Amino acid sequence: MSRDLHTTAGKIEDLRDRVEEAIHAGSERAVEKQHSKGKKSARERIDLLVDPDSFTEIDEFARHRSTQFGMEKNRPYGDGVVIGTATVDGRPIALYSQDFTVMGGSLGEVHAEKIVKIAEFALKSGIPLIGINDSGGARIQEGVASLNGYGKIFRLNTRSSGVIPQISLILGPCAGGSAYSPALTDFTVMVNETSHMFITGPDVIKTVTGEEVGMEELGGARTHNTRTGNSHYLAENEDDAIDYVKALLSYLPSNNMDATPHLPPTETLEKKASDIALDTLIPDSPNQPYDMKVLIQALVDEGEFLEVHALYAPNIVVCIESVNLKEFTFINKSLNQHLHVIRLIWAIRNQRIKCDI
C-alpha cells in the first residue's frame, strides 16, 4: 500500500514501518537458530537487563555504507548492534547489544561508530557502560574500516578506565578484534558452554601450529574463569549472567566522583549468634585452615556479599559488600585453599582487583 509522504499521516506510518523493520532486522530463521542454541536476541537481552519501558534507542536507522562484495544489496537497519540508554533499579546506564542475527554481529564501520557514540556518551555523562557481546569479529567485507573502528573502541575503553564502570557480558562468540575490548573493561561475565572468547579460532591454530584444540579449551567460559582470569563470573545461563550484572551494579558508584548507591539501614548493633561464633572461628593451631567466607559473612550487612573471580586463584577471596551502609572490597586469603601460600596466580588476581579499585 503506497503512502503519501507529503502528509503527516503518511510520514507517521512510514516511520512506524521503519521502526518495525529495525526491531526485526534479523531474519526469522536467524532468530530461530539463535534460540535453538539457548541464546536470546539482542533486544530480549536488553529487556531482561533494564527497568521496564526505560530503554531509549539511539541510531536505530543507521546502515552501513559499504559497496564492496555486493554489500549494497544488504543494508539492514541498526547494522548489527543496538545502542541506547536505560535505567537499572532506577539508576541510569548506557549500553550496547550486538545482534548476531544480523551479519553475525560482525563489526563494520557504522557498527563501530555506534558503539563509540554510546561509549562517549557514558563517559561524558558519568554513567556505567554495559556491553553485550555476541560477534564473529571484524566484518571482512569492510576491510581496514573495521579495524579502525576497533581502535576507536579500545581507545575509549582505556580513557574510561577508572572513571566509569565498564562491564562486558559475553553471551556468544567473541572472536578476533572483539576479544580485546572485554579484556580492557572492569568486569567480564561469561556463560558456561555458550560463551567463547579468543583472538584466533581452532581452525587457524591447527593450520598454523598443527595443534588441535577445541573451542571450550581454547576460549570457553570455564577456561577464562579458571585459567586466564579474563572472566570474573561463570554463569549457568543468560538469565544468571544478567542477574549477576544487575547485582554488581547495585554495589558500584556511577563514576569515580559519585558516592556508592544508598542502601536502607537494616542492621542493628545487637549481638547475634553469628557474632559469637567468630570467637571460635580461628583455630588455635596456625596450621589448621578455616573458612574466610564465614568471617566475611558475619562482618557485612545482611550477611550478603558479591564474590568476584570465584574460580580463579581460589586461595584468595575477593568480594564486594557493604558494611554499615558503606561499600567495600574485601581481599582475603582463603585459608581453606593452599594454607599461607602466595602463588603467582594469587598475586596477579590481588594486583588486578586493586588496580580496578
Descriptions of predicted regions:
Residues 1-167, 173, 178-180, 184-204, ...:
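Terminal-region recognition feature
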